[in-house]
């Protein structure tokens, strides 16, 4: 009877996406994970040595379940991440690591200023790696149950890293979501792409900048980085540009974009290279516009955020000596989740299909805003600016 009760309890625990996690249910979960680890081929000694000491981390649960109270604009995101301080520090790191970076460029085809940009955005050039024990974070997220299968796999991958001797468990710390080291790799990415470039017998992404930068280069090469291409560039859009041509579903050759009137910010013609690109306008028609090349999508293989990809590309440009954007991104009104939900409801009621009314300003909501703008003779850029929000009735 006791065994049957335990099995029923475990089934209910793992099948419920949002059950509160307490010490008792966490202990039951760890008991199940021990057997699952054995079934996955992990040695009993490794499981016992490390799972016996894992602890429930309530902060991790809180962070995983929390949602931002307000929307965050591209201007906020970009300004924080591509700051003058980060640019200057990136240039210093590029100079001090130049010999290594040139070697990595020859080996992997990734220009050094891009590697330094990833390094800067992920951990401020190794300055802050996160201080949450990785096993505690991954075990907590596994047992919380919302994405249990994914985090169970990452927990077992972390145990394999410890089994290989790349890091001591006391040093295996990182973000609340389990990202680790100077490049903030998840364990699965670590196992596939971490490199022992300094030759000390360990893939040490915590203490060795050389290993970390080489690992980033290996990952980007595997994602399909094109050696001779840049990430993209800022461009100037002509008056009357059709913003329905933006986005990755509308890739065109540079020659085609030039025919449509696109130029460099100073008015010079676009390069004549044989490549395709998409137009990205993260802050609407009053903000900067970018052509995104193949390597832009490679950057999104590291982090799926378009804003992140632009930040990496522009930080790399600035580290290499480029100037600031010709057009600074404008601030968008800060909306709370209730306001975004109301916006989605109004757009849906008017037939513009914003999708689920969840209070999150995602791509579906942006497309619905563009449809509203087009129907009301506004510039249909999908940007939630003050004018459109006032006309819809979200702002006074």
PLM region spans:
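Acidic, Ser/Thr/Pro/Gly-enriched interdomain connector segments
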Residues: 293-306, 314-359, 395
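Acidic/His-rich structured neighborhood in mature extracellular/periplasmic domains
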Residues: 76-221, 231-232
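Flexible, glycine-rich surface segments
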Residues: 169, 176-181, 186-301, 309, ...
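Sec-exported extracytoplasmic/periplasmic mature domains
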Residues: 31-47, 52-59, 106-109, 120-124, ...
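Acidic helix-start/capping segments at beta-turn-to-alpha-helix junctions
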Residues: 47-70, 119-123, 133-136, 234-239, ...
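Short acidic, glycine/serine/threonine-rich helix-capping segments at coil-helix boundaries
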Residues: 335-340, 348-392
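An acidic, Gly/Ser/Thr/Pro-rich helix-cap/linker signature
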Residues: 21-108
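N-terminal signal peptide c-region/cleavage motif recognized by signal peptidases
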Residues: 15-17
């Amino acid at each position: 009877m006791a065994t049957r009760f335990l099995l029923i309890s475990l089934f209910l625990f793992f099948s419920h996406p949002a059950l509160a996690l307490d010490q008792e249910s966490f202990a039951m979960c760890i008991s199940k994970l021990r057997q699952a680890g054995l079934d996955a081929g992990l040695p009993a000694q490794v499981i016992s040595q490390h799972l016996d000491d894992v602890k429930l981390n309530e902060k991790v649960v809180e962070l995983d379940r929390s949602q931002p109270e307000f929307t965050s604009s591209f201007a906020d995101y970009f300004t924080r991440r591509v700051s003058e301080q980060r640019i200057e520090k990136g240039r210093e790191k590029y100079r001090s690591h130049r010999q290594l970076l040139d070697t990595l460029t020859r080996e992997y085809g990734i220009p050094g200023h891009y590697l330094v940009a990833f390094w800067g955005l992920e951990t401020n050039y190794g300055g802050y790696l996160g201080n949450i024990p990785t096993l505690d974070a991954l075990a907590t997220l596994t047992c919380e149950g919302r994405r249990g299968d994914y985090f169970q796999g990452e927990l077992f991958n972390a145990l394999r890293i410890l089994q290989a001797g790349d890091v001591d468990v006391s040093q295996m710390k990182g973000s609340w979501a389990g990202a680790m080291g100077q490049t903030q790799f998840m364990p699965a990415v670590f196992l596939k792409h971490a490199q022992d470039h300094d030759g000390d017998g360990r893939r040490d992404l915590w203490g060795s900048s050389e290993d970390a930068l080489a690992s980033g280069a290996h990952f980007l090469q595997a994602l399909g980085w094109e050696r001779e291409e840049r990430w993209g560039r800022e461009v100037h859009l002509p008056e009357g540009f059709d913003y329905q041509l933006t986005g990755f579903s509308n890739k065109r050759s540079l020659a085609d974009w030039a025919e449509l009137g696109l130029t460099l910010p100073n008015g010079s013609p676009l390069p004549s290279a044989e490549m395709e690109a998409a137009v990205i306008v993260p802050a609407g028609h009053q903000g900067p516009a970018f052509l995104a090349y193949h390597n832009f999508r490679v950057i999104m293989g590291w982090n799926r955020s378009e804003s992140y990809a632009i930040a990496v590309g522009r930080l790399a440009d600035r580290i290499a000596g480029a100037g600031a954007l010709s057009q600074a991104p404008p601030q968008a009104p800060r909306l709370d989740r209730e306001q975004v939900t109301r916006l989605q409801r109004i757009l849906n009621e008017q037939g513009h299909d914003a999708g689920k009314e969840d209070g999150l300003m995602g791509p579906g909501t942006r497309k619905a805003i563009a449809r509203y703008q087009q129907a009301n003779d506004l510039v249909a850029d999908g940007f939630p600016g003050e004018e459109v929000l006032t006309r819809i009735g979200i702002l006074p």
